[in-house]
A protein has these predicted regions:
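HTH-adjacent hinge/linker in prokaryotic transcriptional regulators
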Residues: 1-42, 50-58, 66, 73-77
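Conserved helix-loop-beta element of the AMP-binding
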Residues: 58-59, 170
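Conserved phosphate- and dinucleotide-binding cores of soluble alpha/beta proteins
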Residues: 66-201
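Short charge-dense sequence patches
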Residues: 18-22, 47-56, 83-90, 131-136
Length: 201
């Protein structure tokens, strides 16, 4: 795909469930305390986490996302580390052996992970390359928070990159139905927060 087509696809995904993603981002940053080292995964929901970051607090942020790096560039009170790697076709992010090797040099207090899909069996994405980076991010962080809007629950993607016992918390929105909530509580056994979203047009 051409760069313009790739950008369109990313921004089109970002518009989906935008109110939920913004609300999730605002909730997610309440988990951050001053002086933390935070990894922010690539994705449209994690982009909203980056946008909601406080302007001060002596944070260090690592990311593989060009969109997130662009959002945070020049932000006061924040040290930004852009992980190197190969630019992916179809989305503005970096992956590959260089990205994974760079991640092994860092230890973070917290990682915000995005996903294309989650269900009773775990956390999934469409890309083996992105999965490899996400695994390294989780391995290099003391705490892992999955940020995903409710439309991702029950979706079908073929690359599993994390089991539920690797996730400390899920932040999603109140669009989950009763069965999905029971699945998360009783099968996945994951603490989860559902933010309220105003869906009135």
């Amino acid at each position: 795909a051409s760069p313009s087509v790739a950008a369109f696809r990313f921004h089109d995904r970002h518009r989906n469930c935008i109110e939920a993603k913004e609300a999730i981002g605002r909730e997610a940053v309440t988990r951050i305390t001053e002086g933390m080292t935070v990894i922010i995964d690539t994705g449209t929901t994690t982009l909203e986490v980056a946008r909601a970051l406080p302007g001060t607090g002596g944070l260090r942020v690592l990311t593989s996302s060009l969109a997130i790096a662009s959002t945070l560039f020049g932000r006061e009170g924040l040290e930004l580390v852009l992980l190197g790697g190969t630019v992916n076709r179809g989305s503005p992010d970096l992956s590959g052996p260089l990205t994974e090797d760079n991640l092994s040099s860092f230890r973070a207090d917290l990682v915000f992970i995005g996903t294309d899909a989650f269900d009773r069996d775990g956390i999934f994405t469409h890309s083996q390359q992105i999965a490899g980076v996400s695994k390294r991010m989780i391995a290099g962080s003391r705490k892992t928070i999955l940020v995903a809007d409710s439309s991702k629950c029950g979706c079908n993607e073929f690359v599993k990159f994390a089991a539920w016992d690797e996730i400390d918390e899920l932040i999603t929105d109140d669009g989950l139905d009763v069965g999905q909530r029971v699945m998360l509580r009783d099968h996945a056994g994951i603490p989860f927060t559902m933010v309220e979203v105003n869906r009135e047009q």
